[in-house]
């Protein structure tokens, strides 16, 4: 298994698919990396040479924010919104949908399981 950006990449998959196992790299980013390094899309990870794996590593380190750094950046952005006490920050703080979805019905994923109200019958 090749280890890139702290993630063990599956060896039997194609390079494009295997790179997407890294948090922060999707289809387009994986394709950009492969073209920049000059690797064929159809090649599998176990067919890569050490030099190619090293080139992929360097490209990712230089051009992309991935894994822990990306997670930290996202959480810091949310924390900043909460500290500003703007509308989006308040919605994050209350655990409600942030992007304008309705909450009268639905939004159960964000709000958690329904809480029973005492004295109310169906």
From Swiss-Prot:
GO terms for biological process: translation. InterPro entries: Rbsml_uS13_C (IPR027437), Ribosomal_uS13 (IPR001892), Ribosomal_uS13-like_H2TH (IPR010979), Ribosomal_uS13_bac-type (IPR019980), Ribosomal_uS13_CS (IPR018269). Keywords: Ribonucleoprotein, Ribosomal protein, RNA-binding, rRNA-binding, tRNA-binding. It comes from the Bacteria. The keyword RNA-binding applies. Residues 95-122 are annotated as: Disordered. One of its GO terms (molecular function) is tRNA binding. GO terms for cellular component: cytosol; small ribosomal subunit. Part of the 30S ribosomal subunit. Forms a loose heterodimer with protein S19. Forms two bridges to the 50S subunit in the 70S ribosome. Belongs to the universal ribosomal protein uS13 family. HAMAP family: Ribosomal_uS13. Located at the top of the head of the 30S subunit, it contacts several helices of the 16S rRNA. In the 70S ribosome it contacts the 23S rRNA (bridge B1a) and protein L5 of the 50S subunit (bridge B1b), connecting the 2 subunits; these bridges are implicated in subunit movement. Contacts the tRNAs in the A and P-sites. This is Small ribosomal subunit protein uS13. It comes from Caulobacter sp. (strain K31).
């Amino acid at each position: 298994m090749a280890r890139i950006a702290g993630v063990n990449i599956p060896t039997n998959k194609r390079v494009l698919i295997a790179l997407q196992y890294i948090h922060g790299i999707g289809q387009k980013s994986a394709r950009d990396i492969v073209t920049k390094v000059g690797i064929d899309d159809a090649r599998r990870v176990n067919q890569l040479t050490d030099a190619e794996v090293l080139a992929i590593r360097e490209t990712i380190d230089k051009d992309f924010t991935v894994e822990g750094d990306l997670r930290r950046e996202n959480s810091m952005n949310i924390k900043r919104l909460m500290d500003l006490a703007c509308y989006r920050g308040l919605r994050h703080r209350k655990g409600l949908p942030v992007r304008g979805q309705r909450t009268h019905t639905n939004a159960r994923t964000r709000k958690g399981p329904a809480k029973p109200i005492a004295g109310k019958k169906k």
